[in-house]
Amino acid sequence: MRILLQLFGFLAWSIHSFANPIKVEVKEVNGKWSFYRDGKPYEVKGAGGHDHLEKLVDIGGNCIRTWSTDNALEILDAAHAKGLTVMMGLWAQHERHGFDYDDPVKVKAQLDAFRSEVMAIKDHPALLMWGVGNEVDLFYTNTNVWYAIEDIAKMIHEVDPNHPTCTVTAGLDKEEVRLIKERAPSIDVYGINTYGDLGNIKKNIREYGWTGPYVISEWGPNGHWEVAKTEWNVPIEQSSHEKAVVYEERYRDYIVGDADHCIGSFIFLWGQKQETTSTWYGLFSERGETGEVIDRMQRIWTGKEATNRAPILESCLLNAASKNQNVKVMAGDRMEALLKVSDPDGDRLVVNWLIVPESTDIKSGGDAESAPLPVKRKVTKGSKDAVSMFAPSEEGGYRLFVFVYDGHGHYAYENIPFWVNKRSAEMGQARMIQMKKFDSINP
């Protein structure tokens, strides 16, 4: 998915001296493409983000991806200390943010800035590959950007013979494949950010004419643009359990399932962010808890179960309706929610219910969004699996979030979008009660 990064600044980069860069190549051997790091095959089990590195190592990951060179040396050093490698991003500017790829002065300035950045860190032992641009094709009209991508990739090969280059597109499009092949031949690896369409990549990339290796540079749950919507046009999010099932199936069927050409992948997002909701893409809570997705990835990557696993949230209903049933209530009316959740370790669970207004700060391409504040009232009584509350007094769209914590650094979640209709004056006002948490023990 797409993270908004600062416009490139022409900062003074100093060249760092490293004892011995580790050579990375991309080679085809007996019909199978692979990374070769220090002469040995290297399968990328990656994550998009640069925090929680110890957790990534614990679950069997070996590589992280950045989108820019911000704090590059610090990130490389931290990764190297944990035995991880880095796909280092070079944030090529986007047309949708106002950059003009017909302006030779700006294009050259960007190239010169990247040259300095590459020279500074090219010999770091944690460096795996250069990510030359991320989704520069998103909502673009000027295809000259691919000539600029070629200039950057060609420059990298001139100054750094030890690391391959990759460029990343938003999904996979036949025209982009053609343009990259024709205009950016110095790109070694095709990077694809894809979500619900991951299952079509193996077939499409061959049909579109890319015969070399590729990485799935971002993947995860169904994107907010790919799912069903309510009658009031907001997307319906998968629960933590639904996402866990999807991650496991997609990895086994579509990433491992194209081992001849897919030479690695990066689960998204190795962190937390607001994008449509606070939970859509992040694999961590705001406090750093992890969910069922990470448990499943650990089992896939290591063959071992986590010593303590996240709760499994099987279902949640609001007024006896699921999230797919366009729940509507009157302002101030009492609502009833039912939850079915279990913990594989029998841990004591804490359940937290929140009513949050539907986000109005919706951006595109992963640009930064502000999170709406929860409605600070309404829960009247509850237990681990049931709660009663009053609907908000203001008309509009909301989401009922439920978060379940096991006290061991794990959580589960679900949200149900609902619409509040305006209450007429003669209907009277409902009593408002402060929201709180409920603590309960697994049966």
Features from the language model and the residues they span:
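Bacterial Sec-dependent N-terminal signal peptides
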Residues: M1-N20
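Active-site mouth of glycoside hydrolases
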Residues: K27-N30, Y36-I187, G199-N200, G209-W210, ...
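Substrate-binding clefts and catalytic carboxylate motifs of secreted carbohydrate-active enzymes
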Residues: V29, R37, P41-G46, V57, ...
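Substrate-binding cleft/loops of secretory-pathway carbohydrate-active enzymes
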Residues: G171-K202, H224-A228, G271-S278
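Residue-level recognition of secondary-structure-to-loop junctions
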Residues: S388-E394
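Extracellular interdomain linker/stem segments of modular secreted and single-pass surface proteins
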Residues: V420-M427
